[in-house]
């Protein structure tokens, strides 16, 4: 019957009988014949050539006669074909293909259809591949948000440890990037996460330098770095560790030299003709205001050098016990020398000079020594410091202001004659006087004169030295 020509051949009944006969004869499902590369039929005009079913309720494969190649295969480009192809590739490929990270910028337009979709079992991320319109290869669409998310999630699970940043060459000062992130690596145990980016200059993966993330410490070890690696604070920074108390290493020699310098300073000031015409109270006002600065200029002229050592500052408990012992032991009348010592501030109550304050003194001396100031220049600088019209309590302000202006004029003429060229020497000499503002008179008194004069005030010493013949 099958090999003969019947009049019913081509009818619906004939086709049904032949289909039922072929179903019983072929217990196995024929495989789909996917030969040659064909774009497939997407119009759906051709009728179905065959319909093959599998026994036991298995899937049915629908074949269509392609209008391009004339062969029977599933209709490519249709929704059914895409679903079947994707399902077949999902079970066939257990591993996600790695993205081809070549020198291609990738396809960011999204005009090409997806070439493949690969899923991983266990709920792992899905890598979507696109046919690049630049290089013609299949790789994730670079530059898109989806590519960034998938690449970051993939490398987060792959890399167990964060590599160190590789600032190669001179690219470390670049603060921007144009390409995709090269990797994001997380450490187990809640440790810090290092984000790597592909640099648009050197082509390597390193942290985005110059950003807030790069400035943050990448590990707890860097946050707890040794204090030796940190830059030292300047001597005028009171928040640094330079507030430790210090004392003279050789107090007897240094204090005697400082006392001799103070005596020469007062002798220089006292016998100035323009200073002698002032009343005693005005002389005392000027000297009490500038004796420390004048002494520093004298010590710089004498080239006095000294060294200091750290001393242990008394604790708060020792201060409380000393004060309470002094208060409870004052019931009986004390003799005059003991009373004077009792009224004077004890050694624990006095402010001990700190290392930063002593460093300010040494900086001023070094500045003066570097300029090689002559004797006349020292004298003019002393006159500028002595005749200060801004001293509070001064009555003859105009007279003192004229003396300071005249001293500056003489110093300017002297530097112009001794040093050819512009007034750089005059400016450098006056810049040394600016450093005197960082030096406290009480520090000089405690450092150089307290071991000798004891509890005597420096103001009383100035009055006594002005009234006596030196």
From Swiss-Prot:
Motif LXXLL motif 3 in this chain: 146-150
Listed Pfam families: Hormone_recep, NR_Repeat
Spans of repeat Sequence: 1-67, 68-133, 134-200, 201-253
Short motif (LXXLL motif 2): ranges: 80-84
Family to which the UniProt record says this protein belongs: Belongs to the nuclear hormone receptor family. NR0 subfamily.
This protein's domain notes: Homodimerization involved an interaction between amino and carboxy termini involving LXXLL motifs and steroid binding domain (AF-2 motif). Heterodimerizes with NR5A1 and NROB2 through its N-terminal LXXLL motifs.
Protein name: Nuclear receptor subfamily 0 group B member 1
Organism whose genome encodes this protein: Macaca mulatta
């Amino acid at each position: 019957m099958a090999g003969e020509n019947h009049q019913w051949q081509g009818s619906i009944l004939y086709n049904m009988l032949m289909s039922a006969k072929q179903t019983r004869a072929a217990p196995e499902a024929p495989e789909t014949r996917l030969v040659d590369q064909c774009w497939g039929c997407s119009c759906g005009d051709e009728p179905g050539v065959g319909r093959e079913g599998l026994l036991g309720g298995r899937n049915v494969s629908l074949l269509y006669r392609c209008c391009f190649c004339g062969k029977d295969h599933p209709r490519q480009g249709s929704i059914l074909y895409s679903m079947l192809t994707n399902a077949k590739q999902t079970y066939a490929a257990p591993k996600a293909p790695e993205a081809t990270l070549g020198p291609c910028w990738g396809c960011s337009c999204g005009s090409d259809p997806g070439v493949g979709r690969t899923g991983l079992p266990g709920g792992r991320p899905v890598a979507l591949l696109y046919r690049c319109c630049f290089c013609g290869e299949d790789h994730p669409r670079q530059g898109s948000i989806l590519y960034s998310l998938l690449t970051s999630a993939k490398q987060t699970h792959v890399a167990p440890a964060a590599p160190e940043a590789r600032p190669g060459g001179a690219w470390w000062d670049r603060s921007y990037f144009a390409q995709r992130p090269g990797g994001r690596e997380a450490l187990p145990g809640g440790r810090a996460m290092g984000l790597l980016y592909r640099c648009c200059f050197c082509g390597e993966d390193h942290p985005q330098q110059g950003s807030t993330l790069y400035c943050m410490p990448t590990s707890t070890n860097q946050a707890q770095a040794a204090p030796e690696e940190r830059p030292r604070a300047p001597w005028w920074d009171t928040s640094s560790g330079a507030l430790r108390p210090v004392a003279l290493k050789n107090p007897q020699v240094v204090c005697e030299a400082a006392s001799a310098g103070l005596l020469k300073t007062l002798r220089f000031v006292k016998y100035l003709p323009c200073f002698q015409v002032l009343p005693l109270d005005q002389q005392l006002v000027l000297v009490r205001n500038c004796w420390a600065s004048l002494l520093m200029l004298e010590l710089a002229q004498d080239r006095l050098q000294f060294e200091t050592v750290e001393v242990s500052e008394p604790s708060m408990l020792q201060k409380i016990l000393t004060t309470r012992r002094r208060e409870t032991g004052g019931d009986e009348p004390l003799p005059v020398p003991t009373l004077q010592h009792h009224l004077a501030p004890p050694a624990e109550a006095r402010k001990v000079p700190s290392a930063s304050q002593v460093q300010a003194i040494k900086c001023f001396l070094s500045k003066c020594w570097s300029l090689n100031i002559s004797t006349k220049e020292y004298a003019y600088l002393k006159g500028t410091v002595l005749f200060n019209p801004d001293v509070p309590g001064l009555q003859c302000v105009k007279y003192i202001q004229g003396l300071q202006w005249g001293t500056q004029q003489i110093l300017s003429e002297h530097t112009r004659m001794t040093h050819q060229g512009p007034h750089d020497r005059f400016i450098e000499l006056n810049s040394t006087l600016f450093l005197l503002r960082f030096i406290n008179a009480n520090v000089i008194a405690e450092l150089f004169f307290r071991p000798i004069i004891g509890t005597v005030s420096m103001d009383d010493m100035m009055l006594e030295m002005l009234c006596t013949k030196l």
